[in-house]
Amino acid sequence: MLTKINIKTKEIASLLREWLEKKGTADSFLWLNNKIDEISESGKERVLFSAYSAVSRHYDRQKIALSTAEINAVPVAGWNPESWTLVQLSRSLLLLSFPAQDSDRYVATLDKIIGAADVEEAIAFYQTLPLLPHPEKFQLRAAEGIRTNMTSVFKAIAHHNSYPAQYLDDLAWNQMVLKALFVGIPLQPIYGLSERNNPQLAQMLVDYARERLAANRTVSSELWELVMPFQPEVVRELREI
């Protein structure tokens, strides 16, 4: 696993709040601000749950359109919200607003959210993983998300998200990379891909490549790049098939 980064929740929340104030309407931001204050002061789950679901009635799904300066201000390596929508950003901020001093209660509360989430709500949750307090406590939830049959939810974990590289064990990491190839999404947006490469993953990819070649199907060039450091002879052999 990569070195874990100490995330300052207040710093991240302040940044998200600043973006939403500039990018959304005044009425939307007023509603969100009121909900954030109510959630952080009361610590009531029902307020968080209702606000998390209601965001889409107050913000539209337009991309947040960050400037280069705003992107460079992001203090979390591997986290890139450039393609996020206002709805997703608002939901992330709500998750960060719930009191987190009691780690068990915080995790249990967010587990309830993802347990009842629709696709868009699940995407926002998984995108927020690298920003959450007590991130080590969401490893099983992240591994579960990787097994989803919804590509959009899987991409929320796999792409532009530093959480997998920092917290998933090799088994879950390898499954994520292999699944990315299987569902046909690129590997390049996976943070920490080279650093987390390992011999077990290389062998899994060789087996996968052999199956595809036997069925006269193409093999992604990104696959060979991961196998080459461990099995260069096999790469040369299979590329000639």
PLM feature spans:
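N-terminal alpha-helical scaffold/docking segments in eukaryotic complex subunits
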Residues: M1-F98, V177-I241
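Eukaryote-skewed repeat-based solenoidal scaffolds used as protein-protein interaction platforms
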Residues: S90-A209
